[in-house]
Amino acid sequence: MLKAQKLTLAVLIQATLISSAYASEQSESKGFVEDATASVLLRNGFISRDKKNVAPGDDTSSWVQSIMFNAESGFTKGTVGVAVGVIGDYSFKLGPNKHSGNQMIPWENDNRSDPYNQWARGGAYIKARASNTTLTYGTQVLDIPVLASNTIRMVPEYFTGTLITSHEIKNLEVIAGKFTKDQMSDQIATDQNNLKRAYVWGAKYKFNDQLSGSYYGLDSKDALTRHYADVNFKQPLSADSSLTYDLSGYHTEWDKGASASISKYDDTSSDRSNNIWALSATYNKGPHTVMLAYQQSTGNSAYDYGENADGFQSIYLPNSYLSDFNGRGEKSLQLQYNVDLGAFGVPGLSFTTAYVYGWDINTYAYNNTANTTRNAKESEFFNQFKYTVQSGFAKGVSLRLRESIYRNSDSYAAIYMPDTNETRIFLDIPIKFF
């Protein structure tokens, strides 16, 4: 891993030295106050999971109101610019939420019987920028395939550490960072996941208007190493149609003693590893988009993420909905259809439907060998409407309605998730102050 980190650092240094060939972001800075921004996002969210064939009380539902804020100064002028910012959130539950869960509400105790009534979290960060390279230190929301913050619940997952992002070469982004704290969406303590230290590095490059690629790596102390790669090719077919191919995948190796869900591994092995990859083809014509995706997982472990402070959204693969279709040995196939209903007189409204089917899941379970099988199955039928106001005083307000119907084999339900009908309703109201 050290060789990869040194290579990334060398690329950052070389990119800085040749930055004169590309316009400088820092030279365009207007000032500490002049470029300052401040905004608030009001989010009302509801998630309900109706679980089948379970004991009374095992269903989970959560209803929460959150206020997320972000304020950031502009960069000071000069060769090296400095900026500061704060990020945070305040939330309160709506109703008793006695059976809450789903990473929505933190709990007062370990037996998950007493959810918080209200809670607040947050942090600060500082940035330094030279040319087109920015160093950020402090509390951050990460969008890195191998270390990605969960942003699909009420409030984001926060990481604390240092991240360098460089755009010194046109169409190339290079990153390198070190993080020492991880706070998930439903956690109060800033390092409740006990992250020791995680190094990340990587790059993405746009070769031309049709072809792009990326690679990212993660080395988390006493936990795991992970690599991710992606290649995307878009083939124009006509003025309003195209065909896009995408190949992506992860290779992960876990250290001995790393955390794991019982559904994810063969407990007879002390060396856990996994390869998971996906190939998709997406056809677009006007407002219509159809995607066909195949995904496959191999190794003595499933693709396990989030258990080791490695980001609860670190699965940049197409077959991820309520289930991620990432079981041990699993193969899955998805058919998805999306339509932009703006073309039919309703600007801002879209509809997505998808069906995913997974098979050949190895369900060996710790102390539960009666459920051993190599051909368990799962399926999910997904539907979502999303509407975003396009103009007027409410411009940017969005409403998302999502429903999933999930079913699986009894052997997989025993160690993963029972048959479940899930409903999600999220209303987002963004407010920009300056």
Can you annotate each of these PLM segments?
Residues 2, 12-139, 339, 384-390, ...:
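Beta-barrel outer-membrane channel/assembly domains of diderm bacteria
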Residues 34, 61-67, 118-122, 156-160, ...:
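Residues that define the transmembrane beta-barrel architecture of outer-membrane proteins
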Residues 40, 67-73, 124-128, 162-166, ...:
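Residues on the lipid-exposed face of transmembrane beta-strands in outer-membrane beta-barrel proteins
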Residues 44-46, 135-149, 174-181, 201-203, ...:
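Transmembrane beta-strand segments that form the barrel wall of outer-membrane beta-barrel proteins
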Residues 51-56, 95-100, 146-154, 185-193, ...:
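Outer-membrane beta-barrel translocator domains and adjoining extracellular loop/strand segments
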Residues 78-82, 132-136, 171-175, 183, ...:
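Repeated loop/turn-to-beta-strand initiation elements of outer-membrane beta-barrel proteins
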Residues 92, 175-192, 219, 238-324, ...:
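Outer-membrane beta-barrel translocator/channel fold
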Residues 299-376, 380-383:
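C-terminal structural cap/anchor segments
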